[in-house]
Amino acid sequence: MDALRLANSAFAVDLFKQLCERDPAGNILFSPICLSTSLSLAQVGTKGDTANEIGQVLHFENVKDVPFGFQTVTSDVNKLSSFYSLKLVKRLYIDKSLNPSTEFISSTKRPYAKELETVDFKDKLEETKGQINSSIKELTDGHFEDILSENSISDQTKILVVNAAYFVGKWMKKFPESETKECPFRISKTDTKPVQMMNLEATFCLGNIDDISCKIIELPFQNKHLSMLIVLPKDVEDESTGLEKIEQQLNPETLLQWTNPSTMANAKVKLSLPKFKVEKMIDPKASLESLGLKSLFNESTSDFSGMSETKGVSLSNVIHRVCLEITEDGGESIEVPGSRILQHKDEFNADHPFIYIIRHNKTRNIIFFGKFCSP
């Protein structure tokens, strides 16, 4: 499981950096675990360069049994929906004209139980689109309507990946609603936007990353199954969001160093965090191509012969939609700011852009990866 966690973490960082390059000052949010699960399912049906490229981009070199690893992580995470408003939906739709081989169907059946579906894009496009939209809406408890837009698919679509993920967290320690105030959020050195700022004084795991003058904090959600880790620059020092230095230094190794529990310690913290909701529809295709998935999306070079005898088949599209909501909600309310319990306090004031991950603590896999630049 460790090898898979490291692979997923490396892929998450690679894709995050690609998305940052394409949208330097925008909010970013995606679910690396959803994408890597879907691409690993597609990989089962590929051969040759296509299979090798997926393996390289997803960093599977040292991972022994990829499908089984994902099965374990997925079932662990899905159990959490009884504690949180959390859903990760991952689907691979294959046009029935491809007549997927029985070998492919049987080898994916157990590890990717309900993630594979054969549909009819060619002759029943509108009906299929309607079915996928209503199925995703139902699976996400109504969070995502019409995940497929007009131009997401066509009657030429052969293979389609659809990811839909949302999370509405409940904290281990509730933020007192009476302490939420409107404050300026500094989107750059010179500009601000108003934001509802939540405030709490409590003990959290805190660390300093001195070489990039940042702080990192771990905020556990109820039952500690998930945590939000936030990397916050001490100030906005560059001419953009203040995150340039972190983004340059960020790689799979530095992320592991920064989030290593041994570099963090419990501290009494005066915490200020924006209340926010981010919903993103990302098109990861160009970013994945830049990372090295050269043949997967190209009909003349992709090799899906492990799935179908049909020639000229490629992955037609990747739809990836995610929603994250951060509010005061949580467990027992604890000391209200202003009470004299905490004498010496560290401040963690997220009133300027920050990078965050939502981590599954049991497997230490990254469920969501994002940056918050503007309310």
UniProtKB/Swiss-Prot annotation:
GO terms for molecular function: serine-type endopeptidase inhibitor activity. InterPro entries: Serpin_B9/Maspin (IPR000240), Serpin_CS (IPR023795), Serpin_dom (IPR023796), Serpin_fam (IPR000215), Serpin_sf (IPR036186), Serpin_sf_1 (IPR042178), Serpin_sf_2 (IPR042185), SERPINB5_serpin_dom (IPR033836). Interacts with IRF6. CDD domains: serpinB5_maspin. This is Serpin B5. Tumor suppressor. It blocks the growth, invasion, and metastatic properties of mammary tumors. As it does not undergo the S (stressed) to R (relaxed) conformational transition characteristic of active serpins, it exhibits no serine protease inhibitory activity. Coiled coil: none annotated. It comes from the Eukaryota. Its main location: secreted. It is found in: Secreted, Extracellular space. GO terms for biological process: extracellular matrix organization; morphogenesis of an epithelium; prostate gland morphogenesis; regulation of epithelial cell proliferation. Keywords: Glycoprotein, Secreted. The keyword Transit peptide does not apply. Glycans are attached at N133, N298, N361. It holds the Pfam family Serpin. Belongs to the serpin family. Ov-serpin subfamily. The keyword Secreted applies. The record marks R340, I341 as: Reactive bond homolog. It comes from Mus musculus (Mouse). GO terms for cellular component: cornified envelope; cytoplasm; extracellular space; sarcoplasm.
